[in-house]
């Protein structure tokens, strides 16, 4: 009788214990170490890194295509784990508001025109000096050297990091008044310009007046006659159809239009070393792709704009010299604001 009672009592204890263990195993999926398994699907979602990139030019420009190429390569190099959402044409932010948006963390990457921020980062004023670079190869040699490091460090005081520079190319002049070949041809012209006191000053030295305005307002300003001239790269002139409201294009190669690719430094430091390496590699490959596109698209744009009836003029050596002499005083004005290495560079490149 006693044995039966003990057996019965054991059964009452065993049943709840067995049920409890079963429920824990079935619902909690206990592993030998006592930890709950994680949902693999949820882990996959957590592993995906999504970044938003904003820029203000058209998708069919070198920068627009480079941004798409960057997004594609980042996905490929990460096995689909890194997703870059690209917003072109100022869809998220204008070229005036995008830097502050990046500082606030409202966007992850931007590629603004350096010229819009030369009053904030005075080192970048060197990039706006007319005729300071002979060509894109010369420019790349400078940006990839010690002077390039100084230029990249400028935004760090705002908590931003320059990853590298992308290019749009060298700038040309368009107008609907007359061909611009000599400094006196600038007199009476009204230029839309970027937010750069350096650009304002060299156009003033050439005899023109200027109106600062965001990039996406350039076409309406030209169309309505509020300005009659502008400077830009061939691909921007073509893709934004500026040439349709202008009569003359001067191939001057007088200035550089470049795009530092910027990130918020705090955001960048939160990324893993592997993710940073993937993004840098994708950006570098996109930059090389962009340079190839510039040469290809500029030739096509020039041909199609000429076919539309736009009058195209190329500066002669003597005309270029006249422009250089007219803007030479600006080199002295900029040099005194630069740290010693950049000052020496500006002084060495001053037109003689």
Predicted regions and their residues:
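Short, solvent-exposed loop/beta-turn-alpha elements that line the ligand-binding surface or hinge
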Residues: 134-157
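N-terminal secretory/targeting leader peptides
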Residues: 2-133, 162-352
